[in-house]
From Swiss-Prot:
Keyword RNA-binding in annotation: no
UniProt name for this protein: Arginine kinase
Organism of origin: Artemia franciscana
Gene field: ARGK
EC number of the protein: 2.7.3.3
Superkingdom, taxonomy of origin: Eukaryota
Keyword Ribonucleoprotein: no
């Protein structure tokens, strides 16, 4: 049973959301009194409650979504709240839909988006994975963080070929290593206020680490927002090379570490926006003519299911007219389709820029 103190906090949180008239988050939209009363006394087998799910959105009324899953079971137990939010965010993925089986497709059908290097500064494809048998950040113990870091570092240190590299634990990291990783834009910081409020940063920096290959085109974050963030990137617009490297890496890691997968939702992640393929394929791109009117840029982008962000990602501005543009859809389509959607959309934006 959920204790009285938690119930009190839940009621206060619910009232706060109700009273926040300018709050536009999905948690406010879908956490009705009926849903709230249905879920407030439930607890997962690892002890997570509705409070763990909604507290980031309660604390940060400017959240876009406002909920996180403290463990895999939360997606099922708190489905009356997660399902409509998933459907709203992953446009039209209803509670009766199932995410298709994983399919990375034929990488050879992709190419270089910008062979003349006029527009695309860099290309990046990432995915998130959770380790089977472990909860997500808020429910992890210090011992589990350490255990996961050991598993992940030994797996990654066994990679060879172009993926061969070094694992750097955040604990006890030398200042010069830290500075180098910051200069490379590889180092992740302790979570932002959204993650902090979701209790995603406990025991920091225990269990956190960064791996990168010698060429600095392949990167893995261990226990940042998700258990694993697997990232492939390089300068220029050669999406085929970037994607092929990611696919190779995911397959190699999965041989050694089983990932957490849900029959209906695909690969499970801490934040419901990343479910399904978990794939985010993005470019840093300069489109000076289109970007002169950001509203128009966003209109065109949304036609191709693309998301426009500032240069440094979410909640940032575009520096020097450089935008971060990525696929928006991650659920209800295959990995290949998600990447192809970005490929086709960016190709179209470049065409429009050239004719503007």
């Amino acid at each position: 049973m959920v204790d009285a103190g938690t119930l009190e906090k839940l009621e206060a949180g619910f009232q706060k959301l109700q009273a926040a008239t300018d709050c536009k988050s999905l948690v406010k939209k879908y956490l009705t009194r009926e849903v709230f009363d249905q879920l407030k006394t439930l607890k997962t087998s690892l002890g997570a409650t509705l409070l763990d799910v909604i507290q980031s959105g309660v604390e940060n009324l400017d959240s876009g979504v406002g909920i996180y899953a403290p463990d895999a079971e939360s997606y099922t137990l708190f489905a009356p709240l997660f399902d409509p939010i998933i459907e709203d965010y992953h446009i039209g993925f209803t509670k009766n839909d199932s995410h298709p089986p994983s399919d990375f497709g034929d990488v050879n059908t992709l190419g270089d988006l910008d062979p003349d290097n006029k527009f695309v500064i860099s290309t990046r494809v990432r995915c998130g994975r959770s380790l089977q048998g472990y909860p997500f950040n808020p429910c992890l113990t210090e011992a589990q963080y350490k255990e996961m870091e050991d598993k992940v570092s030994s797996t990654l240190n066994g990679l060879d070929g172009e993926l061969k590299g070094t694992f750097y634990p955040l604990t006890g990291m030398a200042k010069e290593v830290q500075q180098q990783l910051i200069d490379d834009h590889f180092l992740f910081k302790e979570g932002d206020r959204f993650l902090q409020a979701a209790n995603a940063c406990r025991y920091w920096p225990t269990g956190r680490g960064i791996y990168h290959n010698d060429a600095k085109t392949f990167l893995v974050w261990c226990n940042e927002e998700d258990h694993l963030r697997i990232i492939s990137m390089q300068k220029g617009g050669d999406l085929k090379a970037v994607y092929a490297r990611l696919v190779n890496a995911v397959n190699e890691i999965e041989k050694r570490i089983p990932f957490s997968h849900h029959d209906r939702l695909g690969y499970l992640t801490f934040c419901p926006t990343n479910l399904g393929t978990t794939i985010r394929a993005s470019v840093h791109i300069q489109l000076p003519k289109l970007a002169a009117d950001r509203k128009r840029l966003e209109e065109v982008a949304s036609k191709y299911n693309l998301q426009v962000r500032g240069t440094r990602g979410e909640h940032t501005e575009a520096e020097g007219g450089i935008y971060d543009i990525s696929n928006k859809r991650r659920m209800g389509l295959t990995e290949y389709q998600a990447v192809k959607e970005m490929y086709d959309g960016i190709a179209e934006l470049i065409k429009l820029e050239q004719s503007a």
